Amino acid sequence: MVYYALMAKDTDLLTLVDRSMATHLEFMLPDGAWDNSWGTRSFKWTYWGGRTSDGFMGGYYAMAAQHPEYLEAIHRNIQLLKKTTSEGLLYGGMHYRVSGIAPCIHHTFGHAKAITSFLELPPLNITSSQELPRDKTYGLKYFKDIHTWLISQGPWRATFTGYDAEYKIKGTHPMGGALSMLW
């Protein structure tokens, strides 16, 4: 969407996408993981992001000149991808390999494609902000559209959700005021 908005010079769309990207960044954990514990498709999610999607790097990089914190998000997520890769294969989570859970080749080639596209972008001459929203201790944030609360207290990060939208497969995500993630 960012690429289209920039190419088409659609400032209305770019403003909308920019707001959406800033909100999404609220859900990145301090170690570069994406918290989609509350989402209707959280069963298709991994600790480092979407199982099969291209991810966020390209769009965030395209907007990094205006938002240096996006470079920090990309850096942290790449570090997390390195930690969850073994023998050239990307595992679905931090402890999958040591737990004997085999990697999925689809994760590997899906993200290799996205990272390759990202690496072909021209370098930016800006400095990362070094701080992301969930690095800060802020107490409680509420996201009305998804009826979800983020908590940041001391070293703890938590997500509570009352998001009761159903996906076509019933019972696939936490609902009704559940603790969906504790970090």
Residue ranges and their predicted role:
Residues 1-28, 32-35:
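Active-site lining segments of carbohydrate-active enzymes
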